[in-house]
């Protein structure tokens, strides 16, 4: 390729560059305008979505309202050609706010919304957003192709950890998607999605792209899953990456069936696991039985003690505290 041709190509790329702002929308549980930079885990959907865009043709900025508080920067809201919004179900109204603000600054801005809020009310959402995405993050590729053209889609979709200003000492990795259980009170059950495993090489690439971190949190809905071979393969991969210096300790979310095999605690501890989170849901056994919590293990206090005795910190959530 000649120098002149290269220059023309460079000028054309500069002229055709797009600007994309990806926001994790967040309503704090206190309903106050406060940042939660030390809350864990932090939202990572914007980081994964950013990986869908070509870094050669797209300037990307990320904003996490969970970590940084409500987005109120008028200059930032007027900047993008495309505004991509994601978040938890409770953030739907916040999506509406940001859409209205952005359109007052730029009437031509393309607004893309996805995640749990859109899957919960897909038809209603179409009144407000240009693109309503009910699928997984890969659907972003289709949106980019339709809105900008296929040249603006990344050759390989890897999370853009370099843009994740809020992660600090922590790294966040996803090795699987959704859950193999169907508890009636769970949002994943309502969405009707199935458990999906990631390719081990893709997991390795995520860790390398993340860079070296002291602590890593695996943000899988269920790190244990229903495939023991896959579980053991990931532990071996984690050991390899620890030896290479990419992480020192890690934590993950598992369902309580993980604790049925005593050896599991030894396996994760030997792989550098610092702590596990699981849904105790309630200390009322009758309530759990009535609500058909499929992964419940009794008695709950014994389960907690077993984890602590093995040297693994036990974190748990409650739906009902009595």
Describe these PLM feature segments.
Residues 2-211, 215-217:
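Acidic, low-complexity intrinsically disordered segments
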Residues 158-315, 320-322:
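Radical SAM [4Fe-4S] cluster-binding motif and immediate context
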């Amino acid at each position: 390729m000649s120098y002149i041709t290269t220059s023309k190509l460079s000028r054309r790329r500069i002229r055709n560059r797009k600007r994309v702002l990806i926001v994790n929308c967040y309503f704090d549980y206190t309903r106050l305008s406060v940042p939660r930079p030390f809350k864990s885990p932090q939202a990572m959907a914007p980081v994964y979505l950013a990986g869908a865009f070509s870094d050669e043709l797209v300037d990307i900025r990320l904003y996490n309202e969970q970590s940084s508080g409500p987005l109120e920067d008028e200059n930032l809201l007027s900047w993008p050609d495309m505004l991509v919004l994601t978040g938890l179900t409770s953030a739907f109204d916040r999506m509406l706010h940001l859409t209205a603000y952005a359109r007052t600054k730029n009437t031509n801005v393309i607004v893309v919304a996805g995640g749990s809020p859109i899957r919960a009310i897909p038809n209603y959402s179409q009144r407000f957003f240009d693109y309503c995405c009910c699928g997984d993050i890969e659907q972003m590729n289709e949106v980019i192709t339709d809105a900008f053209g296929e040249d603006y889609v990344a050759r390989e979709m890897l999370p853009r950890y370099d843009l994740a200003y809020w992660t600090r000492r922590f790294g966040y990795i996803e090795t699987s998607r959704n859950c193999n259980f169907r508890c009636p009170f769970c949002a994943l059950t309502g969405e009707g999605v199935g458990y999906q495993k990631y390719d081990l090489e893709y997991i390795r690439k995520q860790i390398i792209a993340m860079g070296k971190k002291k602590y890593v949190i695996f943000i899988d809905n269920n790190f244990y899953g229903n495939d023991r071979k896959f579980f053991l393969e990931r532990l071996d991969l984690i050991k390899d990456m620890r030896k290479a210096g990419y992480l020192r300790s890690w934590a993950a979310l598992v369902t309580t069936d993980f604790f049925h095999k005593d050896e599991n605690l030894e396996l994760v501890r030997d792989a550098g696991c610092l702590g596990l989170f699981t849904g105790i849901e309630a200390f009322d056994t009758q309530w759990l039985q009535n609500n058909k919590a499929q992964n419940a293990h009794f008695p709950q206090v014994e389960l907690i003690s077993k984890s602590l005795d093995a040297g693994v910190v036990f974190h748990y959530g409650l739906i009902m505290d009595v």
